[in-house]
């Protein structure tokens, strides 16, 4: 090795050699790691190593913080802790796969002197913005600290090549190991205890900032049996049932709701805690549910982080697991039956028919495997004389390699984290449309033979996954930015697309194959003063069409919106839980809502930003709670017994302009009250002065 310089390639070689030695004799893991660390400190190019260390450390210190826990100091952490620096970006499916491992490391090792720091390293323009990263942190409930490398200065200096990447630092910010890619990052945890043993005299093993805010084990056990209050966040997908009801999945609150088209909620499915429990709807658990589709009066659910397909039967009011083991799969062929078959990050679903015998199959966009899979409800014939066995699940489109290659042989084509999938018609032929998110394109699959082609977006180079933008047009000249949803309107022969990272809707006219931005007019008459314009979107995701209406999950706004396709108008859907069957608290009660209106340049402080208390006319507390930065513009606070006479809401909150924060307090009177709801508005005027 050239000892005149020390760089990331040096660490790649050292880490690879160490992993090879451990693979040959895993029983000597601790010995290998200890010997490696001793040699690292005794290298004859220590001056170059120190310079390499200092350059990385100084660049990290310049990054903007996005999410920090109480007491966290970046500089002190690097001197006193073992730091697991996790280079990730929230659009990347492989980064998502490793999040449970990083959260587990934070939970198990934070008291022992290990700190996890997420270094968000964006691919897309949309991902550079602090507010969008915060939404991703909140949706995924990330407990560790996150900083923003929005210019990729640390990413480039380290020489990162792939998401995710982990760089482990010893005390005094000395880089020790580098793990690149999903298959290698999973080794991170087995290295930590040997590292701690080696540096036990140098590491401050006091509780880290993230552990300070953790609840006790008794609290966790108690919470498991108690459904969370119905605060539905980060809606992801929707479907309309045969009897005209709307089902919505909420990735942030790990629940589904089944409601009438007018918003009256029939069922809330799931207790809101991330997990994989089957059973009755009050006890069932999901983990980031996404795509939905109905078949034979049951609703099929892509339970993404559980790597499973679940089934909700509204008649029995129960949920069971159909496909998946609950663990991340790596199989790219499949063929096993039901819950024996491991899968990876299913994202969306659609029901279609075999082109040969017209039997029904469930199609799954498997974002984690860059493929489309099929589940056969009964034995059926498929392309290339393949027989799909009853209850078996297997890959039918995509080699499993990430890419943008079109091919007449479906298993030779490559996809890039396919998300939305739907049926449609093109040139008179039944087809599938796929929102191929990481190639920023829409792909078309001819159902007759599996031929995979491009519709819009992407690039002619099958390895170019950075051909994104925001441009109307046809074919490769049209540009999208990480689209996540597709829905076909048969009456007008239009394909509607959620161009997610452009915060827009687009549509493709099947007669001209031209893609254009689709703008709508807000006619929402129920909007409160200061509420967002319903025609503005923030990471729109799933969408579904029912008659001439299109429903859209506007994820980061935590709204469901309804568009009248005949008139190009939009309203926000509002949900009435007053008669929900499985919410015992809703009987004889009304929902209390709060909206907070701030001056344009202000925002609520990150994390816990204040408290609220609702009192009766005698000044006695009816209910109370905390305010957080991530609550939507109109938040459901609690349920209030209808016999209570509400006088006002008292509040204390902290608002910030840049780095200057001010504590505000006061009272808010109800602005609207009916038998089912009571609404409050806190309006904050421009403060005269700010203090830190």
Pin down the residues of each PLM region:
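Structural microenvironment flanking redox-active thiols in thiol-disulfide oxidoreductases
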Residues: 97-139, 150-155
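Gly/Pro-rich loop segments of beta-rich domains
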Residues: 205-236, 263-288, 318-347, 382-419, ...
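N-terminal "domain-start" segment that seeds a small globular fold
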Residues: 9-76
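Conserved beta-strand positions in repeat-built beta-propeller and related beta-rich domains
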Residues: 248-252, 301-305, 362-368, 432-438, ...
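Short active-site neighborhood of thiol/selenol oxidoreductases, capturing the structured segment around
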Residues: 73-96
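Extracellular/lumen-exposed scaffold segments
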Residues: 539, 566-692
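Thiol/disulfide oxidoreductase modules built on the thioredoxin-like
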Residues: 138-142, 148-191
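Residue-level detector of Asp-centered blade-edge/turn motifs that repeat once per structural unit
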Residues: 240-243, 294-297, 351-359, 423-429, ...
């Amino acid at each position: 090795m050239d000892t005149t310089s020390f760089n990331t390639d040096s660490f790649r070689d050292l880490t690879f050699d160490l992993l090879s030695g451990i693979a040959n004799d895993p029983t000597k893991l601790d010995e290998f790691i200890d010997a490696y660390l001793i040699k690292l400190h005794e290298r004859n190019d220590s001056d170059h190593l120190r310079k390499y260390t200092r350059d990385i450390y100084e660049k990290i210190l310049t990054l903007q913080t996005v999410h920090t826990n109480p007491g966290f100091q970046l500089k002190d952490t690097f001197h006193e802790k073992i730091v697991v620096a996790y280079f990730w970006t929230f659009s990347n499916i492989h980064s998502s796969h490793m999040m449970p491992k990083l959260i587990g490391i934070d939970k198990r090792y934070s008291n022992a002197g290990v700190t996890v720091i997420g270094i968000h390293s964006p691919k897309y323009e949309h991902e550079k913005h602090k507010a969008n990263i915060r939404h991703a942190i909140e949706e995924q409930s990330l407990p560790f600290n996150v900083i923003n490398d929005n210019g990729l200065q640390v990413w480039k200096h380290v020489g990162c090549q792939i998401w995710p990447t982990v760089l482990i630092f010893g005390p005094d910010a000395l880089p020790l190991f580098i793990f690149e890619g999903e298959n290698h990052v999973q080794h991170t945890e087995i290295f930590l205890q040997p590292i701690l043993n080696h540096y036990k005299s140098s590491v401050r093993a006091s509780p880290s900032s993230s552990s300070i805010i953790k609840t006790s084990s008794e609290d966790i056990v108690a919470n498991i049996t108690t459904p969370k209050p119905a605060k539905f966040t980060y809606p992801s997908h929707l479907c309309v049932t045969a009897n005209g009801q709307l089902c919505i999945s909420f990735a942030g609150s790990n629940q589904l709701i089944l409601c009438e088209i007018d918003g009256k909620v029939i069922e809330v499915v799931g207790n809101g805690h991330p997990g994989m429990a089957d059973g009755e709807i009050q006890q069932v658990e999901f983990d980031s549910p996404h795509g939905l589709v109905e078949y034979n009066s049951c609703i099929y659910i892509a339970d993404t982080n559980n790597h499973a397909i679940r089934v909700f039967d509204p008649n029995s009011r129960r949920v069971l697991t159909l496909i998946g083991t609950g663990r991340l799969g790596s199989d790219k062929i499949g063929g096993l039956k039901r819950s024996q078959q491991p899968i990876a990050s299913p994202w969306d679903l659609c029901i279609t028919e075999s082109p040969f015998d017209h039997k029904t199959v469930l199609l799954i966009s498997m974002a984690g495997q860059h493929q489309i899979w099929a589940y056969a409800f009964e034995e059926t014939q498929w392309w290339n004389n393949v027989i799909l066995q009853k209850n078996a699940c297997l890959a039918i489109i995509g080699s499993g390699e990430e890419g943008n290659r079109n091919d007449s042989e479906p298993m030779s084509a490559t996809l890039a984290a396919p998300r939305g999938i739907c049926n449609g018609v093109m040139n008179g032929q039944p087809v599938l449309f796929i929102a191929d998110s990481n190639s920023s394109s829409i792909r078309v699959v001819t159902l007759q033979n599996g031929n995979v082609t491009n519709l819009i977006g992407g690039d002619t180079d099958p390895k170019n996954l950075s051909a994104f933008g925001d441009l109307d047009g046809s074919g490769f000249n049209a540009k999208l930015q990480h689209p996540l949803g597709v829905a076909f309107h048969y009456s007008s022969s239009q394909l509607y697309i959620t161009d997610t990272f452009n915060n827009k809707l687009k549509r493709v006219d099947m007669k001209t194959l031209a893609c254009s931005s689709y703008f709508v007019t807000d006619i929402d008459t129920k909007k409160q003063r200061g509420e967002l314009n319903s025609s503005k979107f923030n990471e729109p995701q799933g969408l579904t069409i029912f008659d001439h209406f299109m429903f859209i999950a506007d994820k980061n706004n935590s709204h469901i919106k309804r568009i009248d396709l005949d008139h190009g108008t939009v309203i926000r859907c509002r949900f009435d839980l007053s008669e929900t069957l499985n919410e015992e608290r809703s009987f004889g009660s009304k929902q209390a809502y709060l909206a907070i209106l701030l001056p344009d340049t202000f925002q609520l402080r990150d994390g816990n930003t204040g408290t609220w208390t609702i009192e009766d006319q005698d000044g006695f507390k009816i209910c109370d709670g905390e305010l957080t930065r991530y609550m939507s513009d109109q938040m459901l606070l609690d349920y209030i017994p209808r016999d209570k006479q509400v006088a006002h809401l008292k509040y204390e909150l902290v608002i910030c302009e840049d780095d200057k924060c001010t504590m505000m307090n006061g009272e808010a009177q109800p602005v609207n009250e009916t038998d089912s709801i009571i609404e409050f508005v806190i309006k904050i005027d421009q403060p005269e002065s700010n203090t830190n």
